[in-house]
């Protein structure tokens, strides 16, 4: 009887050990402790630090508005001194273009809280048409290239005045239809023509992913802005600069009005 009992005990122990081994073999392998490589942000996307003031995952909204001038303003004209067959006799002064209801054209609006990394993939065009820079104010992202065209077929001279970017002064004769320059740092840059002294324009190099230039009715619009609280800045070559706080809510339109008076 004792031998029989010993044999049964041995069989029982072997069965238990076999069951334990089977369970160990079916367990999932342990996860590696090595870190997962980070995914690089898409070119031109706002940086992580730039999004600190927004609410990721909470949606986007829109910012619209107008820039208005309060006060009286006389419409100015600029006489043309040469090449009148192309330039004409005179033109309206573009440095302060105001509509009948005070609408301010060519004001630059941007969200200053948000930044994006430079991207050399962006290109913009600044043309010279009837001895005017078109557009009068051009906004580009940091790292962009500007193609300066000469649609007039006469001699022009493109002369920039800047502090952070390399200034250039290049003749553009009628056969040179295009020249290109890259702007690597955020800055407001004045553009002049030494041949035609009345020609003036601006290149605004912005590191914000959200900017606009007001149209003739003084309006601007920014779409797909992440939810959050921001500082909205407006700049105008004659009226100056001011800021205003805004809050963007998911699926909503935030309307903002900027009012200027003539600086004393």
Could you tell me what each predicted segment is?
Residues 1-19:
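Sec-dependent bacterial lipoprotein signal peptides
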Residues 21-264:
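Extracytoplasmic copper-binding redox domains, predominantly the cupredoxin/blue-copper superfamily
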């Amino acid at each position: 009887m004792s031998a029989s009992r010993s044999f049964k005990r041995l069989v029982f122990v072997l069965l238990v050990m076999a069951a334990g081994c089977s369970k160990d073999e079916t367990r999932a392998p342990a996860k590696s402790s090595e870190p997962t490589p980070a995914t690089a942000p898409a070119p031109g996307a706002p940086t992580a630090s730039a999004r600190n003031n927004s609410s990721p995952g909470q949606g986007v909204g829109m910012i619209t508005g107008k820039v208005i001038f309060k006060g009286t303003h006389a419409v100015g004209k600029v006489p043309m001194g040469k090449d009148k067959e192309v330039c004409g006799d005179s033109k309206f002064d573009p440095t302060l273009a105001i509509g009948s209801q005070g609408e301010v054209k060519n004001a630059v609006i941007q969200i200053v809280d948000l930044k994006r990394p430079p991207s050399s993939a962006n290109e913009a065009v600044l043309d010279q048409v009837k001895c005017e820079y078109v557009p009068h104010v051009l906004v580009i992202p940091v790292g962009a290239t500007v193609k300066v065209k000469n649609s007039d077929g006469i001699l022009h001279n493109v002369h920039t005045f800047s502090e952070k970017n390399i200034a250039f002064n290049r003749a553009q004769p009628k056969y040179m239809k295009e020249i290109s320059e890259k702007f690597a740092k955020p800055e407001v840059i004045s553009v002049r023509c030494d041949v035609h002294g009345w020609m003036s324009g601006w290149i605004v190099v912005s590191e914000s992913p959200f900017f606009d230039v007001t149209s003739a009715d003084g309006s601007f619009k920014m779409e797909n802005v992440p939810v959050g609280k921001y500082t909205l800045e407006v700049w105008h070559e004659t009226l100056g600069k001011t800021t205003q706080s805004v809050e963007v809510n998911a699926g909503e339109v935030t309307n903002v009005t900027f009012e200027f008076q003539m600086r004393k």
